[in-house]
Amino acid sequence: MLEYNIVMRDTALRKLVPANAMRLYTNDTLTRMENFSPQLGSQTTIRHMVLNKSYLLLTVQDTVNFAIKTDLNKADTGQVISKYTYEKKWFKKKHLGMRCNRMMVDHPDFEEPIEFLYLKKHSRKYLNNFEGIPGLLVKYSVVTPDGVLNYELVQKRDYMPNRDLFGVPADYRKVTFDEFMDFMFPSSQSGPGQN
């Protein structure tokens, strides 16, 4: 289990955007990523790393539970060109008692290059976000429309979680993204499950 704290890089925005947390549970082929924010509440993604498919678990209006299916192989990612540039650095740094490799990462939205820390001997497949980093990220930053977010690992526990954690609960309705949008913004046609 990995637990990250998420805060805005810009200290002036930290009062407007409160700190969040992210937990990542994994076994050999599945990951469960749990996020919580005061604005959106709880968000959980269950991803099959081999099949590259996922479910996003959401609760709408505190009553209706949805599991939104996504086939990441078919997802319209387009030709996304990474704006991140990477430069390896010498020497290692300790974080939570672990020796981490260093990488200076730059992006047009960063005021200056930011140091990322990663564990080279641990796979990057669990987070699956920066292709230029050859290991599990421990400390990193992500550009969002609201600003730059800093992620920092605050806890790492090695254990095999209960496999029920990786299933979609029975009270969740499995839908595609289009079916979910039809439910949220109904038109004159019937919504999902009303045919």
Protein language model features and the residues they cover:
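Extended soluble regions of mature proteins
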Residues: 1-195
